[in-house]
């Protein structure tokens, strides 16, 4: 596990975008695993800038998103389809047919989960998976105690996660209670994983992820067993780590 600590959020976003750009430069038809939430927004802005400056070409890239709310229309401005269009896809030359996000409106939701994993496999697997992390160390919508073997599935959202996401809705009641998420088993199959975290409120989750026992109680702790993980933090998120364990960039 490689840990990089950046001066601030802007530098973190720049570093993460550079890693994505390097991946696409190396392999023009890269398969990207993408995440939503506030943390990767800066990275997406940097990627759009890189595209506008002709530094990066997404025309052969395929993308797979981690998750989507169940029973929330994609036209809703809180759906992850909308989020990805608004923050990235509308501003780059990725082909629509190469964008994959779980369909939370599917009639057969169980089949949607199976098909999503099959699509990833058929594409050749995810080359680099972007992750954020929750205060309780959840990744995707994989909450504490979920099995590390789990593939894409429907999850009942924890109250703490609903409260954390309520800021994006008019009220807590409007936050969907279920979502489709790539399971930890699906995430772990990615060839490379890039975990991003900022802020003091993530410091404990990062500490437990890196130093703690590998346990379903700390979902992100499974990353200790992955062969190729890069963790990019700002100073506050890294505040509990031993400085000898990370590189300041």
UniProtKB/Swiss-Prot annotation:
Record GO biological process: carbohydrate metabolic process; glucosamine catabolic process; N-acetylglucosamine catabolic process; N-acetylneuraminate catabolic process
Broad EC category: hydrolase
Keywords: Carbohydrate metabolism, Hydrolase
A GO CC annotation given for this chain: cytoplasm
Top-level taxon of the source organism: Bacteria
Pathway: Amino-sugar metabolism; N-acetylneuraminate degradation; D-fructose 6-phosphate from N-acetylneuraminate: step 5/5
InterPro entries listed in its UniProt record: Glc/Gal-6P_isomerase (IPR006148), Glucosamine6P_isomerase (IPR004547), NagB/RpiA_transferase-like (IPR037171)
Stretch forming the signal peptide: none
Protein EC: 3.5.99.6
Family, as annotated: Belongs to the glucosamine/galactosamine-6-phosphate isomerase family. NagB subfamily.
Protein's recorded name: Glucosamine-6-phosphate deaminase
């Amino acid at each position: 596990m490689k840990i990089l600590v950046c001066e601030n959020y802007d530098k973190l976003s720049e570093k993460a975008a550079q890693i994505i750009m390097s991946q696409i430069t190396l392999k023009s038809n890269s398969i990207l695993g993408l995440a939503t939430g506030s943390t990767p927004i800066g990275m997406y802005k940097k990627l759009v800038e890189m595209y506008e400056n002709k530094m990066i070409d997404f025309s052969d890239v395929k993308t797979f998103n981690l998750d989507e709310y169940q029973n929330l229309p994609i036209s809703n401005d809180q759906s992850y389809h909308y989020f990805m269009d608004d923050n990235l896809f509308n501003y780059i030359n990725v082909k629509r047919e190469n964008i994959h996000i779980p369909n939370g409106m599917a009639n057969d939701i169980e089949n949607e989960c199976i098909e999503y994993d099959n699509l990833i496999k058929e594409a050749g697997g995810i080359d680099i998976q972007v992750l954020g992390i929750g205060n309780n160390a959840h990744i995707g919508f994989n909450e504490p105690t979920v099995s590390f073997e789990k593939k894409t599935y429907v999850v009942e959202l924890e109250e703490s996660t609903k409260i954390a996401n309520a800021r994006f809705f008019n009220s807590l009641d409007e936050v969907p209670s279920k979502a489709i998420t790539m399971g930890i088993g699906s995430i772990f199959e990615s060839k490379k994983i890039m975990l991003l975290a900022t802020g003091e409120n993530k410091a404990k989750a990062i500490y437990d992820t890196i130093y703690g026992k590998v346990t379903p109680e700390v979902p992100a702790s499974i990353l200790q067993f992955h062969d190729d993980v890069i963790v990019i933090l700002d100073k506050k998120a890294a505040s509990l780590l031993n400085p000898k364990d990370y590189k300041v960039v």
